[in-house]
């Protein structure tokens, strides 16, 4: 059977009921209701290789610290609090992948486009009393195009090579906050293994990770 088709949908209900024994005035609750669809079409090119087109949705629900409305004042002019009206962050992804598995080479290549229309971000504003407020909102729109490759190659009976690499371009925008950022990112990891006499192994490996791109800038590497 060369063609394959799978589809599905699930419903998720999540609830939080947060209670503070010593500070009942800080108690709060939150419910999330989400419908999550998925679909995939695959085609077998041979007994050892296939291509696949798929769609899926991933959920990222905000945690307690993002939702907690209790106000914390670091100074008289600086207050921070969560936003109990936050909704589940939903990432939609469309992918095209190619797989081949042989005695010598295993390879997976994946091209993907994903987008989020309600990403959660922290932001600050100064109110009419001159107090700086720090909280969260579903204000980020993200588009990401990526390509990833994973390969395992048995060069000889005693020599093997593994490669994991990915690259992406991301565009983040927030109309509400008047901010935007974009750029390229990616990571690379490679490993060479050589079996030696006397049951010894020699392994060499290395990698690189590009800085993480967020609405506020870049961080890490």
Show the residue positions of the predicted features.
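Hydrophobic, lipid-facing positions within transmembrane beta-strands of outer-membrane proteins
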Residues: 1, 35-41, 51, 92-96, ...
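Outer-membrane beta-barrel proteins
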Residues: 22-31, 83-87, 138, 213-220
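Gram-negative outer-membrane beta-barrel proteins
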Residues: 13-21, 29-31, 59-65, 70, ...
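Surface-exposed extracellular loop regions of Gram-negative outer-membrane beta-barrel proteins
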Residues: 1-26, 32-38, 42, 47-92, 113-134, 158-169, 212, ...
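Outer membrane beta-barrel strand-and-loop segments of large Gram-negative receptors
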Residues: 81-83, 87, 102-164, 169, ...
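Acidic/polar loop patches that form or flank catalytic/metal-binding clefts of enzymes
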Residues: 44, 48-54, 106-109, 202-204
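Residue-level signature of outer-membrane beta-barrel architecture
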Residues: 3, 41-43, 57, 98-100, ...
